[in-house]
Each structure stands twice: as C-alpha cells, then as structure tokens.
Amino acid sequence: IKELNAERVSKGEQPKLVKLAVLLPLACAIGTGSLITKEKEVLLEDNTLEAVFSLPGEIFYPGSSVCACCMLFTLGQPHLKPDGTTRSTFFGYCKDDGFVKKKNLGRVEQFAKDEKGNFTISKWKEIEAEWLDLFERKAVVDGKSAVEKVNADDEWLCEAYMKTDYTKLTADDFQRTLNNYLSYLVKEGNVYENNGGV
C-alpha cells in the first residue's frame, strides 16, 4: 500500500487507507523479544494499530486450543502522527461471547429466555452490539476495554491496560479460583494428601 500511496500522491490524489484485520496467537501481542519487537517496529512504520481484541480462550474449539487475538490495522497510515505523537489504540477484552462448549458439537450459541420460557434474542447478538459500541466510541469500561498509546516495545493486549471491576467479584469467583489453584498444585505434585488431609 505504501508504493500505491506514493504513486497516488505524485498524481495529486489522496492516499488510500485500507483496514486489515488479522487473527494471531496471543504470543504475537505479548511478545517483547527482539524478533517480535523488530516486526512490530516495521509494522508501525507505515501502518496504525487501531485496535486489538482478546478473543475467547477456546474460540476455535474443538479444532484448536490456541489463545488468539484480533489485531486491526489501518494500512498506509503511520502509527506516529506527523507531529511525532503516537496514535491511540483501542483494546477490547472480548473473552465472553455468550457461546458454550458442547462435546461433539463445538461452541454453541446461547439464547436468552423470556418469562414464558421461550427463546428470544441470541446472547451473542447482545454482546456483539455492546462490543461494537465500545469500539466505535473508543469507550473505556473497567473489565471490558482500554485505550492506550503503545509502540513496538509494549504489550498489545487489553489485559495489560484495562482496570478490573472488583465490584462484580463474588464469593463464588474467589472459591473457584482457590479450587483451580489447588487442583493445579495437586496436578503438579506440589500437594500431597496425608493422614490428616491436604
């Protein structure tokens, strides 16, 4: 697109901006090693990182268990503005999309029920509308989104920048976290059951 825009400008035309969405493993967004940082630098020279969306943990279930994110770029527009300041990037935490895993079926869309027990609107449609609204407004909502000025040396994930909304945590959340941690310790062989218990 860089060459195309140079040609357009030489003809007195406006440069063309193209949007590109790409799905990548989280490691590409987290990575700050020399190889990934260099690739990020090259990307940002002529392109703007508009947004990064952290996707559900098992979005490709049952085919793959890789954790992924979606990066949205504007090609042909450097991430640095002409005045040398960095453009802002929207980060969306899109982990809960309203789908559930079902054995032999994969991820299945869920529907809300009305007071009569009839299925109504798709939970996904409600969640999608909220996510699109947050992105379009570049709104910052604790636990859901963040807006930051990042460069090649930074992490490109919402989790690094968003604030947690602790008002929504419950005793069940705490217990579930403790149970998960204990099962991890047992699995790794760090906790043994003895005569008196664990």
What are these regions (language model features)?
Residues 1-198:
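A conserved structural/catalytic subdomain of Rossmann-like adenosyl-cofactor enzymes
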